[in-house]
Amino acid sequence: MNPIRKIIHIDMDCFYAAIEMRDFPELANKPIAVGGDAKHRGVIATCNYAARQFGIRSAMPTAHALKLCRELILRPVRMDVYQKESQYIRSLLTEYTDLIEPLSLDEAYLDVTESTQCQGSATWIAEEIRARIYQTRQLTASAGIAPNKSLAKIASDWHKPNGQMVIRPEDVSAFVLDLPVRKLFGVGPKMEEKLGALNIKTCADLQRYSIEYLLQKFGTMGQRLYELARGIDNRPVNPERIRKSISVEETYPKDLPNSEACLAVLPDLMARLEARIQRAGKISGIHNLFVKLKFNDFQQTTIERVMDKIDLIVLRQLIQEGFARRGMPVRLLGIGIKLKQENTYQSVQLPLLDL
């Protein structure tokens, strides 16, 4: 019988913004954001909690953020600095386990099931890691401790900033009952809306539906919903995880009737893609661009082109070519980049979006 796993999710608090406030103390307690210049149609990569009180969030166009908060202090992205801090923190984590799965520069999963550090207590390990990060880097981190990855990630967000939460194995069944379905991995606003139409607001509501019904209603996602609603997630912490692509997509409440409508929403998708790329940090370089369209008959097409940078004109062309394949209203539109896989560990910084 396999031992109950001890999974920790470490999530740095407002990582980029926190580094800016540490390096420039005069910014403390002021609303600040890290991102691109509004004059060049930049987007917010992250912001501190003071800025979030104004409704500012990551992936928001900088121009809109400045309208929400005229006092917002905009800092340029210093990716080399953030990467250096991330590397230091990563090296610290390796003192506790070799089973580390980085998700981005500022978060990672740790499997400490077999660790003998801190008398084998995952709770104490998380506390010690957070304390050492603050003592050595003057940065705060939040942590979630649970028997699996999904619950650990949910827990790390529970007492942010600078807090941690433990979900014990014996408490999982009770914990998930009142958990809003929007907290589940893969449940975005659109899926939450679909579940809400079935009067599913919590995991307890979701548990009332059979696996057969959920599979019929939501396809493969139905299996995932069935398991997550019961606190089940058997995915291992994967140290060899290599990112192959970065993408964003949106399912629209009203179908996009023509290619012009698809092109009209492209700037928003590009802003979100840029923010996601910035969050990923150092990557191995771009191999190609791709566009995905799902039509209102649920048929799907993907079209791509070899490119070493993101180009708005090329994305517009791909959307037009993809739409022409069926010429029907589009219910889902996505854009993304595929990454070079050779020399993965000789990664280079992503060039800025070519607008």
Swiss-Prot record:
A GO molecular-function descriptor: magnesium ion binding
Protein family per UniProt: Belongs to the DNA polymerase type-Y family.
Protein role: Poorly processive, error-prone DNA polymerase involved in untargeted mutagenesis. Copies undamaged DNA at stalled replication forks, which arise in vivo from mismatched or misaligned primer ends. These misaligned primers can be extended by PolIV. Exhibits no 3'-5' exonuclease (proofreading) activity. May be involved in translesional synthesis, in conjunction with the beta clamp from PolIII.
A Pfam family of this chain: IMS
Q: How is the cofactor bound?
A: Binds 2 magnesium ions per subunit.
Gene behind this protein: dinB
Q: What is its main location?
A: cytoplasm
E.C. designation(s):
2.7.7.7
- Which residue positions does UniProt flag as site: Substrate discrimination? 16
What is the designated name of this protein? Answer: DNA polymerase IV
Query: What domain of life?
Result: Bacteria
- Location(s) in or outside the cell: Cytoplasm
Q: Which cofactor does it need?
A: Mg(2+)
An example GO BP is: error-prone translesion synthesis
What CDD domains does the record point to? PolY_Pol_IV_kappa (cd03586)
* Catalytic residues identified in the record: 107
**What PROSITE patterns does this protein map onto?**
UMUC
Q: How does it assemble?
A: Monomer.
Which sites bind Mg(2+)? 11, 106
For this UniProt record, the keywords arranged alphabetically read as follows: Cytoplasm, DNA damage, DNA repair, DNA replication, DNA-binding, DNA-directed DNA polymerase, Magnesium, Metal-binding, Mutator protein, Nucleotidyltransferase, Transferase
Check the record and name the PANTHER family matching this protein.
DNA POLYMERASE KAPPA (PTHR11076:SF33), DNA REPAIR POLYMERASE UMUC / TRANSFERASE FAMILY MEMBER (PTHR11076)
NCBIfam families assigned to the protein according to its UniProt record, in alphabetical order: PRK02406.1
Q: Which residues form the UmuC domain?
A: 7-188
